[in-house]
Amino acid sequence: MDIRHANSARDAEAIAAIYAPFVTNGPVSFEDVAPTAAEMAGRIERLTETHAWLVAEDGDEILGYAYGCPHRERAAYQWATEVSVYVDPRHHRRGAGRALYEALFPRLEERGYRLALAGIALPNDASVGLHEACGFEPVGVYRRIGFKHGKWWDVGWWQLELPASQSSSSSNASVGQASTARRASPIRSGGTSDSSMIG
């Protein structure tokens, strides 16, 4: 299994296919209409510019993906990022979710983000277990905040201080000043050298 940066043209269709059941079959996503491959490609392109979007791949098959996105629009929130990970149910329990997060967090740190937040529609023991295994701590619950499939759902929030922020002094620099060149740094994974590989 390799972790690499997502390519909007190459990966959008597979990513949209993985995501669609999470939209249509339950409360994991609060979207009510699954995005098309073209819409997903646009999301990948936008978030690659400001955050990071990674995929886990085995051969030519996408197992899952993870990304960071803005937490809130107002300026004081700019050092926080929401993170999400989705793994094809056929490939659960292979470690893809954790591997994706372990590769994602350093990329977000490089871009200046100091805090990762994850919102989880409850109950979801598997997602809670993954996030807590990755070091996230629960910080609160929004009660009955989402209505989907005929019922109200709670959303729990977990947060993780990104390691670089714990040892560095506070900076007033905008996260937008981080170099976009970092996302293309060559790293090896699974014995394969590629400018898009992470590991």
Protein language model features and the residues they cover:
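A short beta-loop-alpha structural element at the N-terminal edge
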Residues: 2-15
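Acetyl-CoA-dependent GNAT
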Residues: 32-90, 101-102, 107, 161-162, ...
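Glycine-rich acetyl-CoA-binding "A-motif" of GNAT/NAT acetyltransferases
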Residues: 61-64, 126, 152
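Conserved catalytic-core motifs of GNAT/GCN5-like acyltransferases
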Residues: 67-70, 117-120, 132, 137-154, ...
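Conserved beta-strand-loop-alpha-helix junction that forms the acyl-donor binding cleft
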Residues: 92, 118-128
